[in-house]
Amino acid sequence: MLQPKRTKFRKVHKGRNRGIAGGTEVSFGTFGLKAVGRCRLTARQIEAARRAMTRAVKRQGKIWIRVFPDKPITEKPLEVRMGKGKGNVEYWVALIQPGKVLYEMDGVSEEIARHAFALAAAKLPVKTTFVTKTVM
């Protein structure tokens, strides 16, 4: 599972998922999976999609993960009254804005890449689209 090795602070404020995305172009591979909406991707969802893609391409080609879960999400235990401080860190998320490239792939045909990204998209809570590298 992806998570930071060390952080400056253990817990963070909830905040809001606003603004525009960075990393909107396919830069490493030839094909990419781009988010259309905004969401919070958990480390488990990122890993599940990666596994689906890896199995679909049968370990050929190369896959890049362009997102990293760097925000800790806390939860209080069940049946605990409100107050008494912030809960414990339960999982890590990456905040996704529209236009962000989530995964990239190279070394496979477009047909295989489309199939692999379709399997990966089914594991993600955000609507996505298939993009290719634009050469200028």
Swiss-Prot record:
It comes from the Bacteria. Pfam families: Ribosomal_L16 (PF00252). The keyword ATP-binding does not apply. This is Large ribosomal subunit protein uL16. One of its GO terms (cellular component) is cytosolic large ribosomal subunit. InterPro entries: Ribosomal_uL16 (IPR047873), Ribosomal_uL16_bact-type (IPR000114), Ribosomal_uL16_CS (IPR020798), Ribosomal_uL16_dom (IPR016180), Ribosomal_uL16_sf (IPR036920). Belongs to the universal ribosomal protein uL16 family. It comes from Actinobacillus pleuropneumoniae serotype 5b (strain L20). The lineage of its organism: Bacteria, Pseudomonadati, Pseudomonadota, Gammaproteobacteria, Pasteurellales. Keywords: Ribonucleoprotein, Ribosomal protein, RNA-binding, rRNA-binding, tRNA-binding. One of its GO terms (biological process) is translation. Binds 23S rRNA and is also seen to make contacts with the A and possibly P site tRNAs. NCBIfam families: rplP_bact. PROSITE patterns: RIBOSOMAL_L16_1, RIBOSOMAL_L16_2. One of its GO terms (molecular function) is tRNA binding. Part of the 50S ribosomal subunit.
